[in-house]
């Protein structure tokens, strides 16, 4: 999410000083118990794929629950969903623990500290005091979401210390005798724990159904729910225990090989080769769960996923320079197929503008619900639909709606109420802050009134008079260069259906002119009477500044190289 929120919300604890909200940042928090996935990958089921896809686990399933298991995921952890666990290898974890005893020097402590830090931070809302400290006092930390991703540090540090431990043992096999106690402790903390998981899974994890799943299953009658939960837990326990046994045997095989090497029974070359093969086979087996053969498809198949539908083709026949499309037939803000063919109101991007996200939550999503209901009741006849039900969608130049039909088909519906690329307004309404600005859009019609934060009062001045003959027309469009023809007898304020963003420069007849923000996300400016060409160019000053710095740095680097060559040449003579 890009940009700092200017909205003041009642729950101030949920807000950070300048980044994302705490709930949003910690939504994907790794569970404390889930951390054992470093040793046993399926400690919480693995990935959020249909449970029914696991054929081995389905051997424990009651066939009468097949349709339900198609809807339930294999993952039952605390995160909303996941593509897979964080796993470094069972034997690698054994070597990591052993490395804490046999590796000497500051490197060991640095790797241990980094590992512990990444684990604690990955817990997010499950260790909120620690997370709050980092959000409040560590620069830039509040700009990132999905705290569980910080385990990538542990995925680097754990294998590194494991390799250092193996290096020590291979170089000095007598360590196995000198550090026999450390060897047993390391085995107990890895292989021993895996064995306990396999033998007593319910002792360590009493429940195998997430709280979200329990809420979703509450609609099932109580007398049917109890046996379903019992069978579901049996299926998931089998997933967990089978992986626990696998980790136990991997650690045991690796530990036996190391012990035999330490006792002089195996040569170093053979030991290293077999251990490498063990790790390769073990990691390959786990990796193939998530990167399997069926995912590798011919390029032609991949490109066919973006083939235009009949609805797309119909919309693309409209050669108007610039307009937007709202897809109501899909998960609007979590799909990008629409954006492949059209300028979309929706689409997904992990770093979308915060202001636009706030508009989605406050206006666009509610208006989509109103629109869907109104169009359905009108049978697709937009003449029977009240435009006041979706004013923000109209100001965003939404020219077409993709509407769902039965059988997975869709149809395009043209919106006759869209305000177009730009328009004159009759009034400018100034507000004191962002809260008033976004809330005022519930009360005004953007076609007539521009809501402007008072900090843009100098850039967007009040409208003196109205003019019935005025018009604005987009005449040239490039993503970074837009030109409009503007004509009016008395001048006024024009609102442009484009996102206000720093770096855009406005020009009237080639002369730079001020512009400001209106309606929370759009651009607005005063245009004098007469016929004019208004142009917006994306030309951020920061680009020129960094370009100058880059050229200076390259010049200094070139001079340094020449000086070095000259000095070397002098010494040679």
Question: Could you tell me what each predicted segment is?
Answer:
Residues 103-308, 529-573:
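Contiguous transmembrane helix-bundle modules in multi-pass membrane proteins
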Residues 6-13, 158-161, 179-195, 276-283, ...:
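C-terminal, active-site-flanking charged/polar segments
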């Amino acid at each position: 999410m890009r940009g700092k929120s200017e909205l003041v919300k009642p729950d101030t604890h949920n807000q950070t000083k300048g980044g994302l909200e705490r709930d949003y940042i910690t939504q994907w928090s790794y569970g404390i118990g889930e951390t054992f996935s470093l040793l046993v990958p399926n400690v919480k089921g693995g990935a959020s794929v249909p449970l029914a896809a696991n054929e081995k686990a389905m051997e424990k399933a009651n066939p009468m629950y097949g349709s339900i298991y198609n809807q339930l995921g294999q993952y039952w952890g605390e995160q909303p969903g996941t593509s897979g666990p964080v796993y470094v290898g069972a034997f690698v974890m054994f070597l990591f623990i052993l490395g804490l005893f046999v590796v000497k020097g500051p490197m060991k402590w640095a790797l241990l500290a980094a590992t512990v830090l990444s684990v604690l931070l990955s817990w997010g809302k499950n260790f909120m005091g620690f997370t709050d400290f980092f959000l409040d006092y560590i620069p830039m930390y509040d700009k990132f979401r999905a705290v569980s991703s910080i385990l990538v540090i542990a995925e680097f540090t754990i294998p590194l210390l494991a390799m250092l431990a193996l290096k020590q043992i291979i170089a000095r096999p007598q360590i196995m005798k000198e550090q026999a106690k450390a060897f047993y402790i390391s085995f107990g903390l890895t292989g021993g724990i895996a064995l306990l998981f396999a033998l007593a899974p319910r002792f360590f994890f009493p429940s195998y159904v997430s709280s979200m799943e329990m809420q979703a299953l509450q609609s099932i009658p109580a007398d049917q729910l109890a046996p379903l939960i019992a069978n579901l837990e049996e299926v998931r326990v089998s997933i967990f225990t089978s992986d626990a046994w696998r980790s136990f045997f991997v650690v045991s095989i690796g530990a036996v090989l190391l012990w035999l090497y330490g006792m002089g029974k195996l040569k170093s070359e053979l030991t290293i080769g077999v251990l490498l093969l063990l790790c390769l086979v073990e990691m390959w087996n786990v990796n193939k769960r998530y990167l399997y053969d069926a995912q590798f498809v011919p390029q032609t198949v991949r490109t066919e996923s973006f083939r235009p539908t009949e609805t797309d083709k119909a919309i693309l026949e409209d050669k108007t320079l610039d307009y937007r499309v709202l897809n109501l037939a899909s998960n609007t803000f979590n799909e990008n197929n629409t954006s492949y063919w059209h300028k979309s109101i929706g689409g997904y991007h992990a770093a979308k503008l915060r202001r636009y996200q706030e508009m989605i939550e406050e206006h666009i999503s509610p208006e989509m619900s109103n629109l869907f209901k109104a169009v359905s009741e009108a049978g697709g006849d937009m003449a029977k639909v009240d435009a006041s039900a979706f004013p923000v969608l109209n100001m965003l130049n939404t020219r077409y709606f993709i509407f769902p039909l039965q059988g997975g088909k869709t149809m395009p519906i043209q919106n006759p109420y869209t305000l177009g690329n730009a328009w004159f307004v009759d009034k400018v309404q100034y507000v004191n802050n962002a809260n008033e600005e976004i809330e005022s859009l519930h009360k005004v019609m953007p076609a007539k009134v521009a809501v402007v934060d008072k900090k843009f009062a100098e850039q967007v001045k009040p409208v003196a008079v109205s003019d019935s003959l005025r018009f604005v027309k987009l005449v040239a469009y490039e993503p970074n260069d837009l030109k409009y023809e503007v004509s009016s007898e008395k001048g006024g304020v024009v609102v442009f259906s484009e996102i206000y963003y720093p770096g855009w420069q406005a020009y009237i007849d080639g002369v730079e002119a001020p512009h400001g923000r209106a309606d929370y996300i759009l651009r607005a400016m005063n245009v004098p009477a007469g016929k004019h060409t208004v142009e917006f160019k994306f030309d951020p000053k920061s680009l020129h500044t960094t370009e100058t710095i880059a050229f200076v740095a390259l010049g200094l680097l070139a001079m340094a190289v020449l000086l070095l060559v000259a000095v070397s040449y002098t010494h040679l003579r």
